[in-house]
């Protein structure tokens, strides 16, 4: 009986794979356990949209596909439900927290300082550098700093009187907040007791639904050990328009995987032209988990919208999208296994006890403008340009694509967190304006409006060079900033590689949770990024984000009912476009205001 059940299960799995995966691509593995992915990306076959069509023709196959995926990934573990934060729900006491977590972050707090003058900004930056404090984030109004509660008097003693009372406790108990940020209490316990954490968390493909999401993959943050198989599955299930590629190898020997999404042109004359390509990257800084989940969400939305959404179908015919969930794969793994707030990569420095380089300060353009020479600093760029292995691999891959693979990069969107900002070059200095400043501002304002119209969230638009208060004071250019900006990725792609539209987008939130954004924000933030991509693509097509699908002259693409919409395809897509069209005049008014 047991043998018959096993045979039946195997047959179900085989049939499901045949229906769910139109062209399964074998991914070879090296002897060290890493996927052997070719950095040279093959062109896509010219086929009609597939992969998703099976679910439309035979809806019953949805159950069969889910069964197959559950067999591949496993069922959800039975763990206690994690209490929500904040609210009246009971939180774990210090006695319940893992000892290693308490040893590292017990007694740590996050303070927010309100800044109003250049002198205050400079004083806070110098004090934080003197005490080796972790500057979490800063904007035109505030700066968030992590430190031990016992060190607060020392910090205040280095600050002017105007700042000594201009702060508040953003996170009064950081250790508890970190513990709450893991997908499950069981996983958090395992993360601080054993390095073999993949056994403690097995992703499931079906459970109780989260509002606004039908896929459990986006109901929680996922570790790299889950993201890579998921990417491999996407490339197999939707092989007509998706390829899994490798950007390079990290310092610790891990692959840096990416998904290339797009459809090759049907006409031979078009196929010989350089392929216009847009990059969406996340995870430069390991602790910024929402940037990683937002890249995977955007990838899923693009992949499953092809053939269903006319706007997305056209974008994938006109552009390739390369989506890199995390450049900093070593650091990202480290945040799951050891230190949730680790920021840099895991590269060795000249100080044995201070590992890691800031990948977003390691690129070659204006690298020398970053004066941080302390290897223990969270912003340490290394001793030379491109010393950071992952930054070097990323840049080399991009150059190789343009020089040898007939690729023309037309856009670069680098996701970070937090503070809800859309930033454009230059990052290294406020004294130099980019040649295409007006175009960068115009598109940046449009991206922020696309987010506001779709979700109501406010994203500010500014030059990446602006310090904590420099944008407030006309004619003032900050030279002593909270964090030096030389060697940034957006500057290098813009200036060295000639990518005309290069942006850093700092995602949710504005500080209530900081890097520890609750899982309930994964889908809403992912939707914001997806709307950014749609507006970005339409803008490059010359449609200013208000493209309308042709009706009578083309064969219509049936729009499914709401319950059948793939994750990420918003029913109100046309409504959003109409509202963007109505408000496009506001963008011109904003640009005129900035010119005064």
Curated annotation (Swiss-Prot):
Family note: Belongs to the peptidase M14 family.
UniProt superkingdom: Eukaryota
Propeptide residues according to the Swiss-Prot or TrEMBL record: 27-190
Residues binding Zn(2+), per UniProt: 285, 288, 416
Compartment(s): Vacuole; Secreted
Residues spanning the signal sequence: 1-26
Peptidase M14 domain ranges (all copies): 220-540
GO molecular function per UniProt: zinc ion binding
Binding site for substrate: 285-288, 343, 360-361, 417-418
Cofactor annotation: Zn(2+)
Protein's UniProt name: Inactive metallocarboxypeptidase ecm14
The keyword Transferase belongs to this UniProt entry's keyword annotation: no
Disulfide bonds listed in the record: 354-376
Biological process per Gene Ontology, one example term: cell wall organization
Keywords linked to the UniProt accession: Cell wall biogenesis/degradation, Disulfide bond, Glycoprotein, Metal-binding, Secreted, Signal, Vacuole, Zinc
Cofactor remark from the record: Binds 1 zinc ion per subunit.
Entry annotated with the keyword Disulfide bond: yes
InterPro entries the record matches: Peptidase_M14 (IPR000834)
One GO location term (cellular component): vacuole
Entry function: Inactive carboxypeptidase that may play a role in cell wall organization and biogenesis.
Organism taxonomic ancestry: Eukaryota, Fungi, Dikarya, Ascomycota, Pezizomycotina
Glycosylation-annotated residues: 114, 400
